[in-house]
């Protein structure tokens, strides 16, 4: 059996095709181009998945699961992205859409920072720990919380949305619409915006 992992970011979509031992057989990436319709983003994701399947020489039916790690609040039970401020997703059925556009039957979805935290808890830096916290930096700033070896999703699936913790009341404008969020200061986007302001 084969598996596909998708890292959907605000800047790039990265896809890897692995075998049952977790060996990466093929990987690729394309720009996300986040300023367009959600279906267009997922069509590019599906095309990249299908390209890798073809390059490895297997059939779509040989892929047991695809897993999508995406920013934002994610209802992993329904396969929906409830909200993502760096992507145009609002109550968007991302799992069903990847199935529709690629033919991959089983698609799992998780918040990207939660997926990274779970990966570290299973096989990485926090292996053997019951509880851990991971902070992810990229286009945005996220967090994954592990309690008793399980991902803590919190209220409305936003337990790890550390980037939207207000650290300065009335501070810098965040892409979520609030002011003073940690993400507005410490994400790549926040650092770029602060640099532009200083150079202006």
Predicted regions and their residues:
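Small-residue (primarily alanine) positions within well-ordered alpha-helices
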Residues: 5, 67, 117, 143-144
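Short glycine/serine/threonine-rich phosphate/pyrophosphate-binding segments
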Residues: 12-14, 115-117, 140-142
């Amino acid at each position: 059996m084969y598996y596909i992992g998708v890292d959907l970011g605000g800047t790039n979509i990265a896809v890897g095709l692995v075998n049952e031992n977790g060996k990466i057989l093929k990987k690729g990436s394309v720009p996300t181009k986040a300023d367009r319709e959600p279906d267009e983003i997922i069509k590019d994701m599906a095309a990249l998945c299908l390209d890798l399947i073809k390059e490895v020489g297997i059939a779509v039916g040989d892929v047991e699961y695809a897993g999508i790690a995406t920013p934002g609040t994610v209802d992993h039970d329904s396969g929906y992205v409830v909200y993502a401020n760096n992507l145009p997703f609002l109550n968007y059925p991302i799992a069903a859409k990847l199935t529709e556009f690629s033919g991959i039957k089983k698609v799992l979805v998780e918040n990207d920072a939660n997926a990274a935290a779970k990966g570290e808890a299973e096989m990485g830096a926090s292996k053997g720990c019951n509880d851990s916290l991971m902070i992810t930096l990229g286009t945005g700033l996220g967090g994954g919380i592990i309690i008793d070896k399980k991902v803590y999703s919190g209220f409305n699936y936003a337990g790890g949305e550390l980037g939207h913790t207000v650290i300065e009341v009335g501070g810098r404008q965040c892409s979520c619409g609030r002011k003073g969020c940690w993400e507005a200061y410490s994400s790549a986007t926040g650092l770029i915006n602060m640099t532009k302001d200083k150079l202006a």
